[in-house]
Amino acid sequence: VTKLLSDEEWRTLMMAEAARARGVLTPPAAKRPACGFQDVKGRLEKVGLRPTRQRMTLGLLLFGKGDRHTTAEELYQEATQARANISLATVYNTLKQFSDAGLVREIALYGSRLWYDTKTGAHQHFYVEGEEHLFDIPAEDLNLADVRAPEGMEIVSVDVIVRVRPKTNS
C-alpha cells in the first residue's frame, strides 16, 4: 500500500478541517451536503486524480461548502485563511484539473473571468452585474426542453447566463 499523504500534508488537511469547524469556512445552506476528508479523497480517486496535499486541501475547501460558485481568487483567499501553503497558480491549475475531470463546471464570464460550479449537472445561472455574484436559476423558471438542434447536429450542452442588476428607482 502506497502512502498518499505525508505527515505534513496530513497536518495541512487537518488545519483546513479545523478552520472549517471554527466557522472560518462555514458552509451556507446548500442542496448537497458538505464533504469530509474521505469524501474528497474518494471523488479524486474516482476520476483518476491522485489525492495530493494540494488537491485534498482545495477539495476540502471547495466541496466542504456543498453546491456553490467560486472563482480561483476566492478559493485562494479561503486557502490563505485556512493557513494552507498554496499559491494562486496552484489553485488555478488544480481547478483546471478538477474541471477537466468533471468534478467542477467551468463558467466563463466576459471572456476572461472564470467561475467554478460544484454542481455539474445541467442548470443555468443568473449573474448580478456590479456585484460579482453568480447563482442558479430555479429549473422551473427556465424551460429549454423545446430547444432543437439544427439539422445534422446534436445538442451537447446548454449554457445560459442571464445578466441582471438591481432596479433603479425612476
Go through each PLM region and give its residues.
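Pre-recognition alpha-helix immediately N-terminal to the DNA-recognition helix
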Residues: M56-L61, E74
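Basic amphipathic alpha-helical segments that dock to polyanions
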Residues: V91-A101
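Short, Lys/Arg-enriched N-terminal segment that forms or immediately precedes the first helix
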Residues: C35-G48
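DNA-recognition alpha helix
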Residues: T71-R83
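Short helix-capping/hinge SLiMs at alpha-helix to coil transitions
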Residues: L49, G64-R68, A82
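Non-DNA-binding regulatory cores of transcription-related proteins
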Residues: D100-S170
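C-terminal regulatory/oligomerization modules of transcriptional regulators
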Residues: V1-Q38, A139-S170
